[in-house]
């Protein structure tokens, strides 16, 4: 979690813009900002956050809807992935809710370069 955009600028400056990914954390499609006392939903659009991160010089994006994480309900980020890839030519990875090979393929078909899998592996789901 970043306290300010200047933190991301420092990270990109230190590591180089070809080595930093920006994680767009969502909850039911809305951006989430993490505070010490828990997450807060942002009133800014996902696209506005990505615009800012891209202007700072990130190398790629991770899109994850936290409402999908551990749900085994399937990923919900496909339409947003497609929308972001129309505007940005960056590597994009996505996760949350992935249950099986079909979900992996759906995320890849939406245009993601890769898929983040966690709970499905820990629970022994057949990927």
Predicted regions and their residues:
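Conserved anion-binding
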Residues: 1-69
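Generic structural signal for helix capping and beta-alpha/helix-loop junctions
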Residues: 29-30, 70, 101-102, 124-125
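Active-site catalytic pocket residues across diverse enzymes, especially alpha/beta-hydrolases
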Residues: 15, 111, 125
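A short, acidic, amphipathic alpha-helical segment used as a generic capping/interface helix at domain edges
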Residues: 46-54, 77-82, 101
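Glycine- and other small-residue-rich loops at beta-strand/loop junctions that grip anionic moieties
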Residues: 1, 64, 69, 73, ...
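Catalytic cores of alpha/beta
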Residues: 3-11, 79-117
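Short, basic/aromatic-enriched C-terminal tail that caps enzymatic domains
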Residues: 117-127
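Short, composition-biased local secondary-structure segments
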Residues: 19-21, 70-81
């Amino acid at each position: 979690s970043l306290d300010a955009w200047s933190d991301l600028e420092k990270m990109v400056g230190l590591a180089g813009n070809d080595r930093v990914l920006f994680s767009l954390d969502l909850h039911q499609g809305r951006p989430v900002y993490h505070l010490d006392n828990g997450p807060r939903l942002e009133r800014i659009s996902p696209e506005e956050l990505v615009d800012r991160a891209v202007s700072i010089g990130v190398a790629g994006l991770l899109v994850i809807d936290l409402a999908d994480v551990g749900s085994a309900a399937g990923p919900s980020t496909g339409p947003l992935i497609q929308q972001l890839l129309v505007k940005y030519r960056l590597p994009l990875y996505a996760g949350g809710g992935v249950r099986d090979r079909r979900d992996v393929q759906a995320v890849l078909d939406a245009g993601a370069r890769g898929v983040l899998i966690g709970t499905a592996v820990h629970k022994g789901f057949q990927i």
